[in-house]
Amino acid sequence: MGVIELHGLRKEYRRIRGGRTVAVDGLDLEVPDGGVFGFLGPNGAGKTTTIRCVLGLVRPNEGSLRLLGADVSSGLAGVIGKVGSIVEQPALFPRFTGRRNLQILGRIHRVGRSTIDGVLERVQLSERADDAVRTYSLGMKQRLGIAAALLKDPSVLILDEPANGLDPAGIVEVRELIRSLGAEGRTVFVSSHILSEVQQTADQVAIIARGRLVKAGPVHDVLSAGRARGLIVKVADVPAAVRLLADAQIPTVVSGDALSVDLPPDQAERVTRVLAAGDVYLSELRPDEVDLETVFLELTKDEGLGP
């Protein structure tokens, strides 16, 4: 049984000029307990709408939802205390200090000073806790939002596009925080359209497009669904290797200190034979890495959902 379970989830919206838009289209999804789960797709894929349905912010037209084993189709009263979330941007008071922001929320959740100090330390904001939030970087504001979501010590943390709009330093800060939260045994559900970032963070992923599930599973398995783009070859004598491969009519491009060979991985032995015949020996031979962005484009194209 998953921590989050969706079966046949569908959400439609009425258009102003008539007709209906389908935001989520019969989505089936199961999120396992513990670790970081990446919920991926382009802008407009239905990620935020799905999260809003899970959190009870909007009601789906069809389908069932279970959160922490409880049916939440009609409300989250039984589990809301175990779930923390940020949907889009965290709601903060910019003129107040970071600590004051958490104290206001702490009254709602009935938590004391020690809890507030603990979450500030957890997100590495203790040294800036008494500065006004308006002086924070975007990454710091996002970390403060995550601190607010941690006040209830939730077992499930749902973050909608937490790296959106951040500079590289802020992205790294949030990435490391998400990783560490997942390592603590929490389930961290992260939606994003930045596929390369989630690849560095998530244990499992689901890819959606146009409100429909395209692929789900452990990151390694999803990456395996992509088609390798070729081979990476490293040798001591690059010019000699280029000549030998060209003579064998094997397309090759020099990329730094490596060669990018346009052959599928199952023809790696052919490359080895050609180079060895010319007394050029390999220091490295491996498939060209397939990333989540490549897999996403391939899978959505196969499903007729791509551009």
Feature roles, as predicted:
Residues 9, 27, 283-285:
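Generic beta-strand hydrophobic packing signal
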Residues 2-4, 11-209, 215:
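ABC transporter nucleotide-binding domains
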Residues 69, 109, 235, 265, ...:
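Short loop or secondary-structure boundary microenvironments that flank
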Residues 1, 265-307:
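C-terminal coupling/interaction segments
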Residues 175-262:
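ABC transporter nucleotide-binding domain
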